[in-house]
Amino acid sequence: MKKILLVRPPRFLWPFINESDNFLLPLGLPCIAGQIRSKLPDIEIKIIDCPPLKIGWESLGKIIREENPDMVGAGEEALYCHEAVRLFNLAKEINPAVITVAGGHFFSWMVDHSLNDFPIDFIVRFEGEETIVELIKAINEKKNLVEVKGIAYKNNGQIIRTPPRPLIKDLDTLALPAFDLMPMGKYSPFGYLWPQSVTLEHSRGCIDRCNFCSLWTFWGQHLKTDIEKGELDVTPRYRTKSVERMLEEIDIVYKKYNRKYIIWADPTFNVDDKWTNDFCDGLLKRNYKDLHWWAFLRADYLLRDEKAGILEKMVLAGLTHPLIGVERGCTEDLRKVQKSVYTRDLVKEVFLILKNKYPQVFRQGTFITCLPFDTRESMLDLVKYAVEIDIDYPAFHPVAPVPGTFLYQEALKNNALEEKDFRKYDWATPIMRSDNGFSMEEFAKLNMELNKRYILYRPHWIFRGLFSPYKHKRGLYWWFLQNTLKMMFLGVMDVVLGKKKFEGITGFMRLKKPGWYDS
């Protein structure tokens, strides 16, 4: 094996953000490529990131023919797993001898389904840097594949799962991501949400056990992983790179690639207060101009950080868009989804601090909706909660129990999945069957009503943001207004022009096919 092609295939667009903001840098690809290049320098490796380059399926086929790789790899989440499958089919049509390797959140869990139904030769399960290097070595040296930990494959029709690979203890030992193989200038060049963005991570894993989240289970300690047989046993694990290593990565993307907006992929950015403090000190010493960042933060830790003076440093160092997982408004609901319990008073205090002391930041909270036990009253209470804590943007997301979450296992057991097409697991479409008689369309209308009540019934909210004295916050409010109007207009025009039939509220939220998709 001499040449490897890693691909993010073409895909549909989120309708409620512009195309430039749709495609953030897929960090897994340069991480895998960097490790292969570091350990196996004789291997030629290329990355084809189709969406930001507007490479459609016809063009991708030409590229694969021209490159003639020995191995094609892709990793996907449930929402886009069908695009990876199409890639593997295309690669095998062009060259039946090509080795296809799948990874990422979906394929790591859905082993039997993937190997039995799709043209996949190997699955690299979960954390992939060490596994892919060892797999390539084993193939090239014709070693016994069963000795490679963390893979799944077929041998004479039988599916083989090798033992889980131990987690990488020291993330600093990993090679730097191969940003030079990515089209760095193409990520959000005209973005409203994340202009000149780059995706980075300083940690892997989480300390919480939310039953709707696949991030902590993916990066956790895997004890039982055969979810297709109902087996799931994972222990949360949290690891972080050193401050020095993280500052080195930021130096590269800022100085070499002029990336000014960091999207932190960490499930929880502010777990370790000492790390955060030292990191912000290092970043402030660099005095980078116009550097901003977006991060998932825990509310209780944010309160801790404020009392220690760390939150102030975070804002000075570039924190512009804190996103807090509020999720639900009552203790009973939080316990049902196995999330750490925040009291309403604690969450309100945190958002009040952000509003009064750091008015330049855009305060966002996420709320999960359309759970089986939801009633009209329980969902409308989330709007009251959002008003109570006075945030800039409440994201009301219908829950999508993807493979690898404990909620998915529970839903399978209770036959609670109303929608089984993973192409609709987009956190905008209701998925789970209601215990209280709601149809999926009724759930969708109710979820839309939450947005209407927060936005349309409170016009001062939108006007306050549109004329904010802070450029970044003002831009986000204009983005919100423009894209809401655009989404509604395009949805109506599709129906008027006969491009599709009216699908109700859910139809406005579906992913849209870009013009370059087939080209």
Predicted regions and their residues:
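Radical SAM enzyme core and accessory elements
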Residues: 3-6, 18, 41-44, 61, ...
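N-terminal [4Fe-4S]-dependent radical SAM core
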Residues: 10-13, 148, 154-202, 226
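Short catalytic helix/loop segments, enriched in acidic residues and glycine
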Residues: 22-36
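Glycine-rich beta-alpha loop elements in corrinoid/cobalamin-binding modules
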Residues: 35-39, 44-170, 397-404
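Conserved strand-turn element in the central/C-terminal portion of the radical SAM core barrel
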Residues: 52, 296-302, 325-338, 351-378, ...
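Short beta-strand/loop segments at the ligand-binding rim of alpha/beta enzyme cores
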Residues: 93-102, 290-292, 360-364
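Catalytic cores of alpha/beta
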Residues: 113-116, 372-388
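Radical SAM [4Fe-4S] cluster-binding motif and immediate context
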Residues: 177-362, 384
